[in-house]
Amino acid sequence: MPISNSSGSSTKSITRAGSELDRADSITSPRFVGRRQSLIEDARKEREAAAAAESSEASEQIVFDEEDGKALLNLFFTLRSSKIPALSRALKVFETFEAKIHHLETRTRRKPKDSLEDLEYFVRCEVHLADVSTLISSIRRIAEDVRTTKEVKFHWFPKKISELDSCHHLVTKFDPDLDQDHPGFTDPVYRQRRRMIGEIAFRYKHGEPIPRVEYTEEEIGTWREVYSTLRDLYTTHACSEHLEAFRLLERHCGYSPNSIPQLEDVSHFLKERTGFQLRPVAGLLSARDFLASLAFRVFQCTQYIRHASSPMHSPEPDCVHELLGHVPMLADRTFAQFSQNIGLASLGASEEDIEKLSTLYWFTVEFGLCKQGDGVKAYGAGLLSSYGELVHSLSDEPERREFDPEAAAAEPYQDQNYQSVYFVSESFTDAKEKLRVYAAGINRPFSVRFDPYTYSIEVLDNPLKIRGGLESVKDELKVLTDALNVLA
């Protein structure tokens, strides 16, 4: 539902922001939107391609895979629990046709018929190609809701942090060598500089120190203009978590108008604060690869800077956007966990869910607002790295709605101008809990768990693995219980 804009200090901030809109238009470059525009577009294209492939398969009515004259069949059917001999009769059918059963599982149907508890069976088996239709007909005589399906195949995802070396699929839409609308397209010196800095990311491997970049005077001048302009605005528009982290970054990581911080130094700072670390990237990653990195508490970060002719906006991610917008927020523990949870939810997800998660990321991590005190503040990196959009977001112009993951994931996003709709979170803790509920509804036959000791992903697809995870939780609870006893 819409958020009221009439609270005390919020009104002051909004009035101030409204009076600054004209100034914003006068000092900003043409309205390029920062960071995740292509994250959603890329996810959408992948989903449409997958849907087209599924449609093609459906039109051919392929319900099994064929290999060496054998059919690999995935078969679902339902047996009434009151029919005790039913299962033995069903298994007899598979035996008669010399079917080799690879997998058999049961589950209670969600909608039992006639008030009786039904059991649904899933059988993956191998049978002679010529016997498929006869086997299915035989099962239909003793079972209900008989159907076949293609095997559900889930996308590969990294299980170890070192496997992020394979997650480097770039989206080239905003490459200055290819995009004629890019501010650097007609500048051969800038394009050559971009290629040189991009090579650092292409060559980088996990575990290596991030190479340092010696920035030019022109690049530092661009940084200085953005840094000084935004820093003054943060005091009235940025959330308290961003302000606190920004002060620490100035104290410990060389944040200042006169120098561009090095990723290696910033990465060490983040790792000590929240366990997040940076990894150099040459441009916009595909949605799936970018989100997978977050699952390991790794943020893929660019080292190049926007073109000097467009200091206040960039059509793509750059170090201004990353260092001023994302890094301070990743220094907050609750927000860092929220970001990682989006990444964990993406692992093995369908193309449709990747698109929804990308859109959810857009309206939170990139363009999110939150309640603080009697007002509303910005926490999204797309806002905190863009003077014009930061002013716009807290003015009277846009609509503000209460954060709801389902609604945010389905909201059309604006990529040609400032957003017309922003979502406002009660708190990062509240947003994290809402995301947890949303992620639980994503259709995967497994859950995942991040192991912070080995920086790996554990796939929870059987009771033994879940029991092992619970043992770890029990150990941690014992430590906390003992601590309470000491204080009692």
Swiss-Prot record:
Which Pfam families does the record match to this protein?
Biopterin_H, TH_ACT, TOH_N
Give cofactor(s), names only: Fe(2+)
Keyword Iron carried by entry? yes
Question: What keywords would UniProt list here?
Answer: Catecholamine biosynthesis, Cell projection, Cytoplasm, Iron, Metal-binding, Monooxygenase, Neurotransmitter biosynthesis, Oxidoreductase, Phosphoprotein
Molecular function via GO: iron ion binding; tyrosine 3-monooxygenase activity
Q: Where in the cell is it found?
A: Cytoplasm, Perinuclear region; Cell projection, Axon
Renumbered residue ranges of the record's region Disordered: 1-29
Q: Which InterPro entries match?
A: ACT-like_dom_sf, ArAA_hydroxylase, ArAA_hydroxylase_Fe/CU_BS, ArAA_hydroxylase_sf, Aro-AA_hydroxylase_C_sf, Aromatic-AA_hydroxylase_C, Eu_TyrOH_cat, TH_ACT
Name the record gives this protein:
Tyrosine 3-monooxygenase
Native organism: Anguilla anguilla
Which taxonomic lineage does the organism of this UniProt entry have?
A: Eukaryota, Metazoa, Chordata, Craniata, Vertebrata
Gene giving rise to this polypeptide:
th
